[in-house]
Amino acid sequence: MSDGTRKRPHVWLALGLLAILPGLAFAGAGKEPKDPWALMMLRFEFDNDTFIGSDDVFTAGWSVQLHSRVMDRWNRGYSGWIGKVPGLGDDGEGGRVVRWAYGLSQIILTPSDISIETPQPDDVPWAGTLGLTGSWWSNDNRKLAALQIYLGCLGPCSHAEQVQKFVHEDLGFGEPPKGWGNQLSNRMLANLNYEYRYKLYAVDVEAYVPGRFAHDLSIGGQAAVGNLLTSVTGQIEFRFGWGLTMGFTKIPDPPGLGIVMEPIYFDPKAPLVDLYHWRIYFNLVARSRWITYFAPAEGGATESGYHHPALDSYPGEHQILFGLHLVRVPFGMHVTYYRYVGSEPPGIQGSIDWINFSFEYRF
C-alpha cells in the first residue's frame, strides 16, 4: 500500500461501497417482490471534496431522507394546502404522481488550511448547519413542480465541530481541525424553495425500459427565499442511458440549497415493466444561480469574539453536474460530480468542487 493511499482511507471506503452494492442487490433476488406502488424509500447521501483531492470550503455534508410511496393523488392531509400550490395539484386517479419526503441534514464548511488555530478573515469561515426538511412534488414525464420547507440552525448548534473532529481525529480520516473556536455563532435558519421543470424533448414511452437506450432534454428553474439561501436558478438537463427512468434528473443538492426529491415517474394507467432489472444511465446538467444571500458567506459574529467579514462574492453561481445512476430495485446508487465553472471568488483559497454519493433502499 502506498503512502498516498494510507493518507486517503476514503478511497478504500468508496471502493468498498462500490463492491458491496451489487451483492446487496442480488441478496433479495429470491424474495417475492412487493407491490411497486407500495414501495417507500430510505436514502442516505454523503457529500465530500476529499474524493477529488481537496478538503476545504464545502468540506462535507450528509443527509438521511424518507420518501413516500408513489401516489397518483394527495391524501386529505396534503390536498387542502400542498395541492393548492401552483403546479403541485394532482389530476385525480390515473394522473400525475405525487410524493413527499422528510429529511435530516448537515453541512460543514472550513477554510483551506484547517491546521491554523487563529482567525482567518481572508478565507471561508468555520461554519456548520443542521436542518430538517419537508418536500412535496408532483410530476409526470413532461412537467414537475416541487416545494420544500427547511428549518435549522447555523453555528455550534449544528455539531459540525464534533462531527469533523470525530472523522478526522478519532477515525484518522484527515488532519486534526484546529480552528473551530472561530466558527460563526448560533443563528436560526428557515428557507422556502420552489422548483419547476419542463421536458423539451422525450423519446417514446416504450424506450424507458431496462436494456433500451433512451435520452431526453429538460429545462427548469428554482427560487429560494430565506435566511439560509435567497437565490434564483436556471438550468438545462440532458439524460441518457440504458433503462432510463421516466421523469427528471435526481439532483442531490444539500437540503435547503436545493430540494430533496425522487423525480421519477410511473404511468398510473399502465403496468410497470421490468422494474426489478438493472438500469444504468447518466445526466449532464448546466445551471446558473443568482444569489443575493447565503448565510455562511455573510460572515458575522464568531465564538472567539471577532467578526468574520462577508465574502467578496458568492461561490458556486455557475455549475456543471455529471451524474451516474445505477439502479436495481430495491437498491440504487447515484454518483454526482459538481464542477464549478469560472474563476473562484475572491476570499476563497481552495477548490469548491465536490462529489455526492447517494445510496437508496426501497421497502
State where each predicted segment sits.
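Cleavable N-terminal export/targeting peptides
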Residues: 1-35
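Short loop/turn motifs that connect adjacent beta-strands in outer-membrane beta-barrel proteins
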Residues: 28-39, 70-98, 139-146, 200-217, ...
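N-terminal ordered "arm"
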Residues: 36-81, 332
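Residues that define the transmembrane beta-barrel architecture of outer-membrane proteins
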Residues: 56-62, 126-130, 145, 186-192, ...
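Long, hydrophobic/aromatic-enriched structural stretches that serve as scaffold segments
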Residues: 85-163
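Outer membrane beta-barrel transmembrane domains
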Residues: 112-115, 237, 243-363
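Extracellular/periplasm-exposed beta-strand and loop segments of Gram-negative cell-envelope proteins
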Residues: 121-123, 160-169, 175-187, 224-226, ...
